[in-house]
Amino acid sequence: MDMRAPAQIFGFLLLLFQGTRCDIQMTQSPSSLSASLGERVSLTCRASQDIGSSLNWLQQEPDGTIKRLIYATSSLDSGVPKRFSGSRSGSDYSLTISSLESEDFVDYYCLQYASSPWTFGGGTKLEIKR
């Protein structure tokens, strides 16, 4: 019996299944935003696949320090001011800051942890309007 055919089929199936693996893409918008002190702003991440409530919002300081603000879509981390809130509408996840303060003008990222590998949005740079 010729064993080359089963080996070729196995190889083809292996390539096929590797090719169908698709990491979850997180599309974050806007990439940058200019706003004024006291203004209300919202940032959005859209998930390419269902991630349920498995979404964090992170804040990155200029020195690289990362702080989690929101976990499980809408739960506020301990010590995070109540002006931050998270919500979901379908595959769109939002971070809202109700009244901007000077320390809020940094970078923000969403992170999905529903499926490995965990994936980040591209980030939003929040700048003060001059």
Swiss-Prot record:
Residues 72-78 are annotated as: Complementarity-determining-2. Residues 79-110 are annotated as: Framework-3. GO terms for cellular component: immunoglobulin complex. SMART domains: IG, IGv. The keyword Ligase does not apply. Disulfide bonds join 45-110. Keywords: Adaptive immunity, Bence-Jones protein, Disulfide bond, Immunity, Immunoglobulin, Signal. Residues 23-45 are annotated as: Framework-1. It comes from the Eukaryota. Pfam families: V-set. Residues 120-129 are annotated as: Framework-4. Residues 111-119 are annotated as: Complementarity-determining-3. InterPro entries: Ig-like_dom (IPR007110), Ig-like_dom_sf (IPR036179), Ig-like_fold (IPR013783), Ig_sub (IPR003599), Ig_V-set (IPR013106), IgV_Light_Chain (IPR050150). One of its GO terms (biological process) is adaptive immune response. Residues 1-22 form the signal peptide. CDD domains: IgV_L_kappa. Residues 57-71 are annotated as: Framework-2. This precursor was synthesized in a cell-free system directed by mRNA isolated from myeloma polysomes. This is a Bence-Jones protein. PANTHER family: IMMUNOGLOBULIN LIGHT CHAIN (PTHR23267). This is Immunoglobulin kappa chain variable 9-120. It comes from Mus musculus. The lineage of its organism: Eukaryota, Metazoa, Chordata, Craniata, Vertebrata.
